[in-house]
Each structure stands twice: as C-alpha cells, then as structure tokens.
Amino acid sequence: MAMLFRPPPSQCRSFSPFVFNYSSREVSSSSRLSLKTSGDEENWVSRFRSKSLSLVFSGALALGLSLSGVGFADAKVGVNKPELLPKEFTSVIDVADFLSNGQEKRIAQEIANLEKDTGFKLRVLAQNYPVTPGLAIKDFWQVDDSTIVFVADPTFGNILNFNVGATVDLDIPRSFWSRLAGKYGNMFYWKEKGEDASIEAAVMAISSCLREPVGRNNCAEIQ
C-alpha cells in the first residue's frame, strides 16, 4: 500500500510523474471552501492505495503522460526492464547518470544508517523516463509499507517524486512531501544547481524528518 505525492501546481509548471493531489482546500477570490472526506471517499482512497503501487513502479507515469499526448490506456501498460537493474543489491539506482560514484556511496551510507536507526527503508531511483527499470524495482527492493521510493526524474518539470508506504504515511505529515518537492525539486533549483544537488538535498531532508519524534510539529521545516 502506498501514497503518491506531487508538488502542487503552483510549485511546478509541468505535471509531476507520480500524481496524488492532497489539496484539501480550494480558494476562490470570494471564499474558502473546506472539503471533508466522507466514508465513501476514504474507502476509495484505500482502494486507490492498493492499486497505485503497481502504477508507480511501471514507470509509465500514466497521469502525467496523459497530459503529454499519451493516453492513460497506453501508459498504464508500463515499463518493465530488469536488464537496467544492477547485478547486486543497492539502495541507489542511477540509470540517468545524475550522480557521481562518490555521491552514490554517500547517499547509500546515509540510507543504511537511516534504516538501522529508524527501520524506514529509503530507496532512490534516478531516471529519465522512459529509460527506467520500471516495475522491476518493486521486487528488486522488496518494497513494503515501510519503504519510501524516491524517484528523481526531470521529465515533467519537478524532479522529486515519492511513493510512500502506509506505515511511513502514518508518521510523516503528508504536506512534508509536497513542501520538499517545492523546495528542492522545482525546475529553477535543479537547473541552477544540478540534478545531483536536488537528489542529495532531498535525501538529507527525508533522513532528518524521519529521525524526528512523531508529533504535531514533526517535519515542520525542510532541512
């Protein structure tokens, strides 16, 4: 089970690859309307979670592609290229060559320390769609409810995209992911500083957030 996150439209001109809109309020010039989730809507979200994981790992970016002229029916078929996976296990897969060897090692070490300290499993995939292992990473990483899959892909503007397991979703405010994407994933940031800088900054921010005590104000600031 998983939740998908994208930055809100105001923070990204293009549609982000992995899409789930958590906006609970729409503001007009005359009023602000609060939307409450009904029991039926909650059931729908639950069903969506169970189906969303396979769509994310397909690498098809189905909803995003539908805005680029590719229909959902075609996009949802997805990508499954296990030949793009490394031969040995690693928590960082960079098929787009955004990261240097040293950066990959630093990120992998940070991820290992995080998993040891918290039990949460962060996994990083850097890609340029459609060059992606797609569905194959699900089994390669043995993705479960304690896993955060961070996909760095600049195809649709904002480079930061997240698939968050249900256990993680219980502890981390949902707004954290959109705020993180807005700060380090926007096109202006990664074009100026580089894709590698966006990836490293996001990993450190996630690590810092996951180490904070769970409470009303955890992850309030993006480190």
From Swiss-Prot:
Entry's Gene Ontology cellular component terms: chloroplast; chloroplast thylakoid lumen; thylakoid; thylakoid lumen
Pfam families, alphabetized: TPM_phosphatase
Superkingdom of origin: Eukaryota
Compartments it resides in: Plastid, Chloroplast thylakoid lumen
UniProt entry keywords in alphabetical sequence: Chloroplast, Plastid, Thylakoid, Transit peptide
PANTHER family, per database record: THYLAKOID LUMENAL 15.0 KDA PROTEIN 2, CHLOROPLASTIC
The protein, known as: Thylakoid lumenal 15.0 kDa protein 2, chloroplastic
